[in-house]
């Protein structure tokens, strides 16, 4: 079988061992005679799956007991509406804009009430993330929202905000489980699964218990976090197979040694790629060094007419998904947990050869 390295931003690369395990269990899960795809979400087999998935996720991500974990649908985009519906309660909210996705969260929240921008780096092209020390927080606001890793612009927060006055809400879609996080610093964390957790379709939400009682009475039941908690994320049929696949990824991470181990691997991979980009004038990355994402690495070629031929040449060598997002162009390598360092080395070797020939 042809070796392919998938640098797509999402849906993204999955661990090979996870894919092989899913393949072996596809037609008969643990002697049940059924595929997980066929199981009733309320049957004993699937209930055992989802309970273990939550237990493993809590252990892996060190989720405190006073937080609930939800397995929902609609992607992070749905949370752009669910956050104000569940938290605003007639107050205003603060938003930090550090890239396309955090700006989208702000814009999607506007119909629900008074939203203010606490900080923004849009004027500098999102070249760095606004420092939490500079956020203009309104202590009477219902919450402050930010995106801790911007997938398109390649901007990541490494020093998380420590704000005690109001709840902090974080969109962690594209770097969740890439390193340990102190969850007690947050009121809500949410993440689409299709980047660093598993297949598309699943959205994980972590909510502190004290934030479950302030939802707007107009909140649809499927959007109400408390209602979802009371129904074990099953107010409607959940994304059963995506949850099962996420569970296999959690087991893979646990067997690997946990988030401390995967963080070291991610640092090594990012250093290899950024190291080569910085070593030559042929390629460049525009992001402030202290905010360079370990997961999403955008870069450009000095002669921008070469971007298309670079991507095509990479595809011919089995490296796919390198075309930059349509909003910013250029090239982007998404190097999530499941991307082996061999994939990064193959990309760097190709970058060297491409530079020599151009």
Predicted regions and their residues:
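Conserved active-site segment immediately N-terminal to the catalytic lysine
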Residues: 169, 183-194
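PLP-dependent aminotransferase-like
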Residues: 77-144
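Active-site C-terminal subdomain of aminotransferase-like
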Residues: 15, 193-274, 288, 357-358
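Conserved N-terminal alpha-helix of the aminotransferase class I/II PLP-enzyme fold
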Residues: 33-79, 86, 108
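PLP-dependent enzyme catalytic core of the Aspartate aminotransferase-like
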Residues: 2-4, 316, 329-358
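Conserved PLP-binding catalytic core of the aspartate aminotransferase-like
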Residues: 283-314
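A glycine-/small-polar-enriched, mobile loop at the entrance of the PLP active site in fold-type I
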Residues: 3-54
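Active-site phosphate-binding strand-loop segment of PLP-dependent enzymes
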Residues: 10, 109, 120-176
């Amino acid at each position: 079988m042809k070796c392919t390295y998938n640098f797509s931003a999402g849906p993204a690369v999955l661990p090979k061992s996870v894919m092989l395990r899913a393949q072996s269990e596809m037609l008969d899960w643990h002697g049940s005679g059924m595929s997980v795809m066929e199981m009733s979400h309320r049957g004993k087999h699937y209930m055992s799956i989802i309970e273990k998935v939550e237990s493993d996720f809590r252990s892996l991500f060190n989720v405190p007991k006073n937080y609930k974990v939800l397995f929902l649908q609609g992607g992070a985009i749905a949370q752009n509406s669910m956050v104000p519906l569940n938290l605003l309660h007639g107050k205003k909210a603060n938003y930090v804009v550090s890239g396309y996705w955090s700006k989208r969260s702000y814009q999607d929240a506007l119909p629900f009430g008074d939203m203010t921008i606490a900080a923004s780096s849009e004027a500098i092209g999102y070249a760095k993330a606004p420092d939490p020390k500079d956020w203009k927080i309104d202590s009477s606001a219902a919450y402050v929202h930010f995106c801790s890793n911007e997938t398109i612009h390649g901007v990541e927060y490494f020093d998380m905000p420590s704000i005690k006055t109001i709840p902090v809400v974080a969109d962690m879609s594209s770097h969740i489980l890439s390193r340990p996080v102190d969850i007690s610093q947050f009121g809500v964390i949410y993440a689409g699964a299709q980047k660093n957790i598993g297949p598309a379709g699943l959205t994980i939400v972590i909510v502190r218990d004290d934030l479950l009682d302030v939802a707007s009475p107009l909140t649809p039941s499927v959007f109400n976090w408390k209602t979802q908690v009371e129904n074990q994320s099953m107010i409607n049929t959940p994304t059963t197979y995506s949850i099962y696949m996420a569970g296999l990824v959690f087991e893979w991470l646990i067997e690997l040694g946990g988030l401390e181990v995967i963080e070291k691997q991610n640092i090594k991979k990012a250093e290899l790629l950024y190291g080569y980009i910085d070593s030559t004038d042929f390629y460049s990355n525009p992001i402030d060094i202290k905010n360079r994402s370990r997961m999403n690495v955008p870069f450009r070629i000095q002669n921008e007419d070469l971007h298309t031929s670079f991507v095509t040449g990479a595809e011919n060598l089995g490296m796919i998904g390198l075309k930059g997002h349509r909003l910013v162009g250029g090239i982007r390598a998404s190097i999530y947990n499941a991307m082996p360092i061999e994939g990064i080395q193959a990309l760097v070797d190709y970058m060297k050869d491409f530079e020599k020939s151009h």
